[in-house]
Curated annotation (Swiss-Prot):
Its cofactor is Mg(2+). GO terms for biological process: coenzyme A biosynthetic process. Keywords: ATP-binding, Coenzyme A biosynthesis, Cytoplasm, Magnesium, Nucleotide-binding, Nucleotidyltransferase, Transferase. The record marks 19 as: Transition state stabilizer. Substrate binds at residues 11, 43, 76, 90. Belongs to the bacterial CoaD family. This is Phosphopantetheine adenylyltransferase. The keyword Signal does not apply. It comes from Streptococcus equi subsp. zooepidemicus (strain MGCS10565). The gene is coaD. Its main location: cytoplasm. Transmembrane segments: none annotated. It catalyses: (R)-4'-phosphopantetheine + ATP + H(+) = 3'-dephospho-CoA + diphosphate.
Length: 166
């Protein structure tokens, strides 16, 4: 395990308990784990980039070998090189995720052949959870307890109290 540094990336819009499970498990496999928060150019964000980063930082604060890094734009492999990462960490919930990730891995390997990609299977109980489903629940003010970290719940409650559009 010595010298192994992982990078787990996503838009985390918002961070879910599925993401947190991946981050916690990766923190046991690597000396250090960076969690890179990106904007997805193919999606309209629900939460601002700053709020997503804040909620993610609060969610991982108890994990001493995990650091959140903001990389609003760019490629994960570029951030990985900048941070001297040895492994990209990807989570898989189902075969659709696998097909998508296999395509990404091909290009990541072409751009950075020295950085390995590893896949962690999602915990069975967390497989149905996705940020897009959470956003739907939030939009309808449905309960999200047990699906997301407390930092997300706190932010949603705060915004609901102020009747702000998220």
């Amino acid at each position: 395990m010595s010298g192994k540094i992982g990078l787990y990336t996503g838009s985390f819009d918002p961070v879910t308990n599925g993401h947190m499970d991946m981050i916690k498990r990766a923190s046991h496999l690597f000396e250090h784990v960076y969690v890179g928060i990106f904007n997805n150019p193919n999606k309209q964000s629900f939460f601002t980039f700053e709020l997503r980063a804040q909620m993610l930082r609060e969610a991982v604060c108890a994990l001493p070998n995990v650091t959140v890094v903001s990389a609003e734009h760019g490629l994960a492999v570029d951030l990985a090189r900048e941070l001297s990462v040895t492994h990209l960490i990807r989570g898989l919930r189902n075969t659709a995720d696998f097909d998508y990730e296999a395509g990404l891995e091909y290009f990541n390997h072409r751009l950075a052949p020295d950085i390995e990609t590893i896949y962690l299977m999602a915990n069975h109980d967390l497989q149905p959870i996705s940020s897009s489903r959470i956003r739907e629940l939030i939009a309808f003010r449905a309960p999200i307890t047990g699906l997301v970290p407390q930092a997300v719940i706190n932010q949603v409650e705060k915004m609901n109290e102020n009747n702000k559009k998220i």
